[in-house]
Amino acid sequence: MNEKLSFMPSLTDAYVIGMKNVTSIVVAVILYVLTVWIPYINVGTTIAISNLPVELSKGKVISPLSIFDAKYRNVMGEYFLLQGVMAAGIGIGFAFLVIPAIVISISWSMAVYLLLDKKISWAQCLTESNKMTMGYKWKIFFLQLALAFVIFITLMIGTNIPYIGWLIVHIAVIVGLCAAVSLNAVIYRELQKNDEKPAAAE
């Protein structure tokens, strides 16, 4: 049985997916920024951007124009309710010296994807997300930390190189954005597999 979320394979897979969809992701983000001021439309596009990892997890090459699909606006009530509950729970976690907030945020990190992909209630999304991430929280944390570290180092190098540093920074931002979205896609895809979960301590 293949182990879920192995470190290097997951990062490599995220990079491959990100580069395969780099144009689509960048154009989708640009379209989102250009239209974010339009009332009502901006609700759907915000939800659509949140859904990018779900689409990427299915092996699709996404269409940037899909962020304008009406189906995303149809779930705005459940989406806002879910986000509000998550923000409240994580906020309370911060009041207990940060670490509980980090654990809760990872536990619920799949909830939005489940809402948009499986069309289940917001409360069930939180429960299912917690079940999915059980035993994998450390892996998720270190995968995201590793990606953030690589992006940070690249940006630091770019800002200290004369003449071409700005180009390195811009490339790092684009690649980092695509890799971050793609890493979430890999995590969501892997956690949906029906393999037996490890009994690792949280």
Predicted regions and their residues:
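A generic structured-segment signal
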Residues: 14, 52-56, 67
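Selective recognition of hydrophobic, aromatic-rich stretches within alpha-helical transmembrane segments
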Residues: 32-61, 90-123, 127, 160-195
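Membrane-helix interface linkers and caps
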Residues: 59-70
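Interfacial aromatic "cap" segments that immediately flank transmembrane helices
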Residues: 2-34, 68-92, 104-155, 201-202
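Cytosolic juxtamembrane C-terminal amphipathic helix followed by a basic/polar low-complexity tail immediately after
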Residues: 194-202
